[in-house]
Amino acid sequence: MSSAPRRPASGADSFRTPEPEILGPATAGFPEQEEDELHRTLGVERFEEILQEAGSRGGEEPGRSYGEEDFEYHRQSSHHIHHPLSTHLPPDTRRRKTPQGPGRKSRRRPGASPTGETPTIEEGEEDEDEASEAEGARAPTQPSPASTPSSVQFFLQEDDGADRKAERTSPSPPPPLPHQEAAPRATKGAQTGALVEEVMAVAGGTAGGDDGGASGRPLTKAQPGHRSYNLQERRRIGSMTGAEQALLPRVPTDESEAQTLATADLDLMKSHRFEDVPGVRRHLVRKNAKGSVQSGREGREPGPTPRARPRAPHKPHEVFVELNELLLDKNQEPQWRETARWIKFEEDVEEETERWGKPHVASLSFRSLLELRRTLAHGAVLLDLDQQTLPGVAHQVVEQMVISDQIKAEDRADVLRALLLKHSHPSDEKDFSFPRNISAGSLGSLLGHHHGQGAESDPHVTEPLIGGVPETRLEVERERELSPPAPPAGITRSKSKHELKLLEKIPENAEATVVLVGCVEFLSRPTMAFVRLREAVELDAVLEVPVPVRFLFLLLGPSSANMDYHEIGRSISTLMSDKQFHEAAYLADEREDLLTAINAFLDCSVVLPPSEVQGEELLRSVAHFQRQMLKKREEQGRLLPTGAGLEPKSAQDKALLQMVEAAGAVEDDPLRRTGRPFGGLIRDVRRRYPHYLSDFRDALDPQCLAAVIFIYFAALSPAITFGGLLGEKTQDLIGVSELIMSTALQGVVFCLLGAQPLLVIGFSGPLLVFEEAFFSFCSSNDLEYLVGRVWIGFWLVLLALLMVALEGSFLVRFVSRFTQEIFAFLISLIFIYETFYKLVKIFQEHPLHGCSVSNSSEADSGDNATWAGTRVTLGLGNGSSAGPAGQGRPRGQPNTALLSLVLMAGTFFIAFFLRKFKNGRFFPGRVRRVIGDFGVPIAILIMVLVDYSIEDTYTQKLSVPSGFSVTAPEKRGWVINPLGEKSSFPVWMMVASLLPAILVFILIFMETQITTLIISKKERMLQKGSGFHLDLLLIVAMGGICALFGLPWLAAATVRSVTHANALTVMSKAVAPGDKPKIQEVKEQRVTGLLVALLVGLSIVIGDLLRQIPLAVLFGIFLYMGVTSLNGIQFYERLHLLLMPPKHHPDVTYVKKVRTLRMHLFTALQLLCLALLWAVMSTAASLAFPFILILTVPLRMVVLTRIFTEREMKCLDANEAEPVFDEREGVDEYNEMPMPV
């Protein structure tokens, strides 16, 4: 039947909840009362016009004949694929029209409800007018000319159509139905509160009244998502659809309604019904909000719709993106040539040299991104394509392009041929193995292949219509139906070195994205396809390396199109390399998800104005702005629960998420107090000792052996250096022998029992300063230095027990960067000062003389010859004497001062240069690291050889005894009498030793706990945990016991511990070019530290070699440690800013977030505290410098918080140091910690 035009229903009418009404039949005249009831029941405002015209005209209007022009219009307007706007959109929102064949029943959905209630839509942000206009614009279908007026049918479920199948067998008009036979549909549920639209069905019978009509029955609620047909059946072009068998015609409306509408209305209707308009959202209503309006179809049992195989859940993987462009080779043959690739950053192929350029951040044009979004909005999108070969994928893509009217049917073979062209890569000419481009299949074998109509159809394969004209098509057999061809005998495919090297950089389980772009002149307009395979498969001869492919992007078009194909290819490649976008591509269910992901990418992109940039400094703000946007993006991502795409909405969900995060943080906190005596110590034992056996099994690795050799020299060099200087300070009461033995013994015990065996314990600068101060105090008060150390050790053990019992290790959290930097800067100044002080002293003992001045005043020429000839012997006996001159050590030797200066400066500059060389660009990285790590031993060796080669100049040597002996056997033995060696030790000093014990405990506590904090940072990814309480107790207790033997105290050495941890860190080989290396694992074991301690102890047997080391060389190492420990100290950097104009200040947080004067005020306060400490150390009260140092903690907590705001303190006193694993120039372990060496 033909219907009169109807006007769009309003938004209020479209979403009214109907009342339960009884629907009866309508006679030819339709009385007024029944018309009112029908109005109230169906709520369609112009239902009166439809039915009256149907009753009046009936079958009198002759059928319209269609010509070739009409069929051409039908083909051009009906082959657009209809994609749902959202997965949440219920099926009943997509209107479907049945063709006007004989016996067809027209159907209509009610547009409004009889009640005046206006319900709310769950998606409250949508525009109701747009949806209502779209609903009202849908027109009735045109009847067959031979048919009589038929009723409107509404089916809510498949069984409705089954029950009424008999009623559709005759073209006769239906008889009237009783008014009381229809029943209401189920209303909305109280639990969900969702809107349920009540739809009443009017059943029609045959004209002859064979069965007299079917009685009405209560309608059940439609199951969401059920359809009476498969959406995949709509994927066919119009030319394949016969008029009499057409199931789903795509004409926008019928002729009668089209005559009353303007051209703009028709275009809008066609666009709304058959296109997926980008940027326009329809009303999103949950599936359970409405029932589905289904339709039975003639000639088919309306049973359950056969469903495609369920989509496997897609877990996002790392991606490898390859951009291939359609270019001509040397023989002027077209081929796909790789021009760029993305692992994380873009790498381009240099055209002239055919080699890969440096990785860089991809810079995209804004227009290319807009063009990409437009092509994705209108191109072909195939998600979860079930194909295993490139020809199979290409065939599906080409068919989809034909269906979506992107290409003509006659261009099918040309596009398919272009997709199957050869792929070439820059590394092909470098490889001499079997060529990679093995034919994946003969294109000629595909041309004569017919599609079997009886074969099982794939959901993505178009099948010919029943009764339609058969058409010759290109078809590829499924891979499961054909056995793979056997390779030729004797030929194997081996990976080249280039492939192996590239595969190391690609993350494990990565999946590839192939981007194909190019110009072809046989197309009249660009065509695009985005494909996601159901399962990742390796496509032969496509990629540079054998990585399974999951995504393909194709863009072909003529050169006349106003489109830059290369830039669009770079844009989609960059998008796929972006983490958020490729995760969205994995989880996308439809085209809208991809478009939304592109919009999210644009939200975090930066657009540069088209202005000329004179220097790179002008672009610094761009990087900072980008970091801010990425930080905001990450913060928004953290708010989302893992595995969900929604933000926690309620306050309870957010509170629960915060509680879970806080619980995880508290559970892993080793400094958390238990409230029980020794509770922290017990937790340390329970946490660490269960891994005791694995601490030895994990050492069975070649990397551990290399770490032993490296750490041995890293531990021996400071032991020799500090031992020699300690002998100078204590008149050989404690020297190299004692320090080596203490390092070995305490190192062995700590590695066997400690909670964090990655710590390297050793002597340090702060302990050297304390030993010098305590020795001066004992000398001035006629006290025995070694006996006093015994009583200090006794009190140290008691203090450690008290601290561990009270779980006092948490106090290390209050030692902020403010105190650490003052401490580290003070020790560095002491190192540098002592170096030049010793050098000046050498110049005083051996002054420079003119050439004409005789040296007889000091010694005659014979004596000089004797000193020169016996320099080694004198050096062995007097090399480390620190007492007044006259103990057999020569004075006034010519050139001694100059040679000492050369040795000191040479040692410093060689060690410093090798440290810089480690992060330089010469030689491979492995060679540079070896040279840089052994920089200090290499510097010592070179300078010792230089000194040994100069035989006629005297230099003071290191004092090392022969064999297992103390440094000065005539002064002391291996066991110290606590009551006094030469005289009785005063009792008051036994008690007063508590004060220096507190001071040295402060030093050991700060160094050990802060070092443990640095080692235990979460960035290092340690798995076995640490033990603050257990390690502190062991180190202090061992120091107290070693004092009985006259051995020095030790603490956790920060630089050596960090070096040890870095040496045992295994970095991932799958590092994208240009990216920072990531930690794969850390070899947490006890064997390396144990072997290093044993080797240091055995070094006592190489005393003959150690006695050849001049003290000037040790002064150079001392200077090196003082200078390098200044790196990474923010206080030192802010001192530079005092002399620098603000425009040259660096782009760091404490400069940008804090005003310059306030920043300088903070620096001045630190400088004042440093000056106070230096003044204390220059007086007789130098022993109390640890107490003055610890006072800076309450100063920072009480005074500075009143001067500076909380935000300023976070910027100026924040610990931003991170573990350093990459090879940035001038950055190493010293930059990681503001702690003294």
From Swiss-Prot:
Gene source species: Equus caballus (Horse)
Gene name per UniProt: SLC4A2
Compositional bias segments (type: Gly residues): 205-215
Annotated SUPFAM superfamilies: Phoshotransferase/anion transport protein
Region (Membrane (anion exchange)): 704-1237
Residue ranges, compositional bias (Acidic residues): 120-133
GO biological process: bicarbonate transport; negative regulation of CD8-positive, alpha-beta T cell differentiation; negative regulation of CD8-positive, alpha-beta T cell proliferation; osteoclast differentiation; regulation of actin cytoskeleton organization; regulation of bone resorption; regulation of intracellular pH; transmembrane transport
GO cellular component, one term: apical plasma membrane
Function: Sodium-independent anion exchanger which mediates the electroneutral exchange of chloride for bicarbonate ions across the cell membrane. Plays an important role in osteoclast differentiation and function. Regulates bone resorption and calpain-dependent actin cytoskeleton organization in osteoclasts via anion exchange-dependent control of pH. Essential for intracellular pH regulation in CD8(+) T-cells upon CD3 stimulation, modulating CD8(+) T-cell response.
Family, similarity comment: Belongs to the anion exchanger (TC 2.A.31) family.
Phosphothreonine sites (modified residues): T253
Predominant location category: membrane
Protein name: Anion exchange protein 2
Residues found modified as N6-methyllysine: K270
Locations listed in the record: Apical cell membrane; Basolateral cell membrane
Region (Disordered): 1-237, 286-316, 445-466
Topology with respect to the bilayer: Multi-pass membrane protein
Biased composition (Basic residues): 76-85, 94-110
Annotated keywords: Anion exchange, Antiport, Cell membrane, Glycoprotein, Ion transport, Lipoprotein, Membrane, Methylation, Palmitate, Phosphoprotein, Transmembrane, Transmembrane helix, Transport
Extracellular side: 843-893
